[in-house]
């Protein structure tokens, strides 16, 4: 998807997936920052002052680009964790289900064995047992239950069904135990993957926070220097700088991406959309926490899932990618240019239906979206960003 300006695309490719072994930090050459004396000297000459202003503004936009790239990495790694946790939860549910089946099957097999023991005891008392019955009652000689059962040539015809059922139940219980063992091994592997993904996501969040702390510190200096060069107040200069930063962020894409319709999708259910909106807006200002889905902490797919759940609509698991697949399976994808309030939108680093979607938002209309983006931000309403925006939106209701 060629929606990023060349400079930002280069930054994101290097910063997002660490191609060629380079980190985001290594992607940006460390440029020397102007000293207070250099700024003071520049004030004495109009040309030098103009050049110094441009230099400082360039430094600020470069720092912003670094932060944007790190935010993207943090969102990608957060989605990797959510996917891994989804898989872990699915296997954990499988283990729990199998454990219940094993417990029930073991109890049934035990009960069947007791029934056979009662029959054998009765036969012994009635003198109907021979050597094979002795084997049945003597585990040390027989070796195992199935061998014991196979040796019972004198079990009465009326007991034959109980005998066969006991064997089947024993075999069924053993089969379930084998499945449970495999599932537990799979769960251990999935848990390890999820833990690694969580650690990677936390490291990305820490790196992002460190960059923001550095940028705040440097920006205080740059704002003061620019204010002195332009002979305005620091507060006014800060407003100018914030406008520059906002423009830099918003200019990472050109606008809605053209895409063909895949199939007919009906209009949304406005009542359900409004319920989802009302729920989501009640969370504005609440913190982002990786894996959060309420009651007062959220991540991107957590708030979309909970908001539509409040309206009785299932949009997928706690994963941006899974929510995209859910919309695709239900044939509810529409070209991004045809999106209406209530539709879900995704961000992806590949222009591929099967690629991961690292961020999901709720479209509010009029070019605005509601999101829980990353550890530095809270749940918020902001202008739609077009950089990395996937070309299809999803309509949870119709």
Question: Which residues does each predicted region cover?
Answer:
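Alpha-helical coiled-coil
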Residues: 1-7, 73-172
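Hydrophobic packing segments in regular secondary structure
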Residues: 2-65, 193-282
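Aromatic- and glycine-rich peptidoglycan recognition patches
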Residues: 2-4, 11, 22-29, 40, ...
């Amino acid at each position: 998807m060629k929606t990023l300006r060349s400079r930002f695309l280069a930054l994101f490719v290097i910063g997002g997936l660490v191609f060629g072994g380079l980190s985001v930090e290594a992607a940006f050459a460390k440029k020397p920052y102007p000293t207070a004396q250099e700024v003071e000297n520049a004030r004495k000459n109009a040309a030098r002052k103009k050049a110094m202003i441009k230099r400082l503004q360039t430094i600020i936009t470069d720092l912003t680009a670094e932060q944007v790239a790190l935010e993207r990495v943090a969102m990608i790694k957060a989605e990797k964790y959510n996917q891994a946790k989804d898989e872990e939860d699915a296997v954990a549910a499988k283990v729990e289900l199998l454990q219940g089946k094993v417990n029930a099957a073991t109890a049934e097999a035990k009960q069947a064995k007791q029934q056979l023991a009662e029959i054998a005891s009765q036969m012994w008392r009635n003198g109907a047992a021979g050597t094979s019955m002795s084997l049945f009652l003597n585990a040390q000689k027989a070796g195992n239950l199935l061998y014991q059962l196979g040796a019972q040539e004198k079990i009465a015809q009326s007991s034959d069904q109980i005998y066969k059922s006991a064997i089947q139940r024993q075999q069924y219980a053993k089969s379930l135990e084998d499945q449970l063992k495999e599932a537990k091994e799979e769960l251990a592997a999935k848990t390890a993957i999820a833990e690694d993904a969580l650690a990677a996501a936390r490291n990305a969040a820490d790196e992002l926070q460190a960059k923001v702390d550095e940028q705040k510190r440097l920006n205080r200096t740059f704002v003061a220097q620019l204010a002195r060069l332009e002979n305005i107040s620091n507060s006014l200069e800060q407003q100018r700088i914030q406008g520059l930063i906002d423009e830099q962020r918003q200019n990472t894409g050109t606008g809605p991406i053209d895409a063909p319709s895949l199939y007919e999708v009906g209009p949304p259910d406005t009542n359900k959309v409004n319920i989802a909106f009302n729920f989501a807006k009640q969370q504005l200002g609440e913190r982002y926490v990786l894996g959060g889905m309420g009651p007062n902490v959220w991540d991107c797919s957590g708030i979309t899932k909970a908001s539509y759940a409040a309206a009785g609509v299932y949009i997928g698991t706690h994963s941006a990618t899974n929510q995209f697949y859910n919309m695709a399976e239900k044939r509810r994808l529409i070209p991004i240019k045809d999106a209406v309030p209530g539709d879900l939108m995704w961000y992806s680093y590949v222009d591929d239906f099967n690629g991961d979607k690292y961020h999901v938002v709720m479209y509010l209309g009029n070019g605005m979206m509601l999101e829980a983006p990353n550890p530095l931000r809270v749940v918020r309403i902001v202008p739609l960003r077009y950089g990395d925006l996937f070309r299809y939106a999803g309509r949870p209701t119709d």
